[in-house]
Amino acid sequence: MGSLSEWVQQGWYKGSPWLVPLRPLSALVSFEARRRLQRFRKQRPRPPVPVLVVGNITVGGTGKTPLVIALVEAARSRGLKVAVVSRGFAGKTNHYPQHVTASSDALDMGDEPVLIARRTGVPVVLDPDRRNALDVAIREYAPDLVISDDGLQHYALPRSAEVVVVDAQRGLGNGRCLPEGPLREPATRLKEVDFVISTGGGWAGAYPMIMRPSGVTCLADNRTLTPDDFLRLHPQVHAVAGIGNPKRFFNLLSILGLSATPHVFPDHHAYQPADLAFTDGLPVLMTEKDAVKCAPFAEPHWWFVPVTASLPEGLLDQMLDRALGKE
């Protein structure tokens, strides 16, 4: 992680007096966020089809993508046609809208949209203007349900239900809005959404979500080992993570019993082969989100850990029912 980014995040989550002079700017961000939310409440446009927004109120990753995948799979198991809309953060393309498929380049389209397309096989429409992405998805794919990957603060996007994911390990930091703190909106926003989901531990008023590894897969040939089999063969590894909270991945590997040398990269990092050219020959283990970017130049000793979101029984159906207006 770059030193400036790391320094800022340490201030947000561990406290630092140098942030205090930024408070007036944070107050302006908080005021504007409240104003935009109030305007949205008054207008409250109805979406043409049910729209379920999965987002967060903090900067950085909280584990939204596994939840989006779980919701897509749950909806498809009910016979629903699903499309996903996304911004495609950190993708290189500047032509929109884009239709993301399993064969799309993650460096062009962004790692999360490509991961969703590969895991689910549903249409993914990319556009920073999420209202336009929604219109394109409806026109091109006639879905019964649209799930928005992020976009909670994009109030031009009409929605039927909102889900917020909170990283319980990091929490809301100092509770301040940008730039003094990590919040995109005031913490009171959590009281207004339909569901709050916590990853990495318990959170008051939230439903817990556990990331369960479904195996360890080789980037080069897609063969998969159980975590126990991988551990027996490779007890020591290099662990690579370019996600919002790398510690979450490293903790998972520790729980699996692996001895891992951690290597932290910025969220959405555009990997090059030299980034992973470790000289000791140990296997390299990474997140699935990192793997979609490293696959084009994968080596035989590079592996990733797919995870599945595990939630309380019936919760996925509750979220879908809320979005579909069945509650």
UniProtKB/Swiss-Prot annotation:
Q: Which reaction does it catalyse?
A: a lipid A disaccharide + ATP = a lipid IVA + ADP + H(+)
Recite the UniProt keywords alphabetically. ATP-binding, Kinase, Lipid A biosynthesis, Lipid biosynthesis, Lipid metabolism, Nucleotide-binding, Transferase
Q: Which GO terms describe its biological process?
A: lipid A biosynthetic process; lipopolysaccharide core region biosynthetic process
Tell me the Pfam families matching this sequence: LpxK (PF02606)
Q: Which EC class heads this enzyme's classification?
A: transferase
Metabolic or biological pathway: Glycolipid biosynthesis; lipid IV(A) biosynthesis; lipid IV(A) from (3R)-3-hydroxytetradecanoyl-[acyl-carrier-protein] and UDP-N-acetyl-alpha-D-glucosamine: step 6/6
| Keyword match ATP-binding | yes
Catalytic activity, EC: 2.7.1.130
Cystine pairs: none
Q: List the molecular function annotations (GO) for this entry.
A: ATP binding; tetraacyldisaccharide 4'-kinase activity
Functionally, this protein is described as follows: Transfers the gamma-phosphate of ATP to the 4'-position of a tetraacyldisaccharide 1-phosphate intermediate (termed DS-1-P) to form tetraacyldisaccharide 1,4'-bis-phosphate (lipid IVA).
Q: Which family does it belong to?
A: Belongs to the LpxK family.
Q: Under which name does UniProt file this protein?
A: Tetraacyldisaccharide 4'-kinase
